[in-house]
Amino acid sequence: MLCTSHIYECIENGSGLFQHGHTYLGHPVAAAAANAVIKKLINNDLVTRSAEKGKKLSNMLESKFSQHPNVGDIRGRGLFQGIEFVEDRETKKSLDPDLKFATKLKMNAFEAGLICYPMSGTRDGKNGDHVLLAPPFIIEDTQLDELVEKLDTAITATLGKYV
């Protein structure tokens, strides 16, 4: 139980018993933590900041990767951005699942110093590859540049050089 020393002393000097329950124990603490996060988001205008930085990140991704022959789509909202990888950009045919693209991209991204979320099975549970990017709300412009460069390094290492 979390409480102030004053509350604890009242219980201790009373019956010594604190009988309570919830259908989902621990929820008050989780709710208090969530409330603190919401206050931080509002007081520091982080939602607006996320939208602004997200637009910048989206533009950077479009500029860097939109003409890549293996990029089928780039989209997102705020700082939550995704890139779909395909065998052919025009037909949007998925990469062969046997290539294990997401696994290789994750390894290459990690080696480049980038933590991201590549996954396969985007289309039907087996076919389709993508990477999700979700940098923190407090990311700076220089770090956005670094993120895109590291992602480019990882994609190039995974798929090979492109023009």
Q: In which residue ranges do the predicted regions lie?
A:
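Conserved N-terminal phosphate-binding loop of PLP-dependent enzymes in the Aspartate aminotransferase
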Residues: 1-163
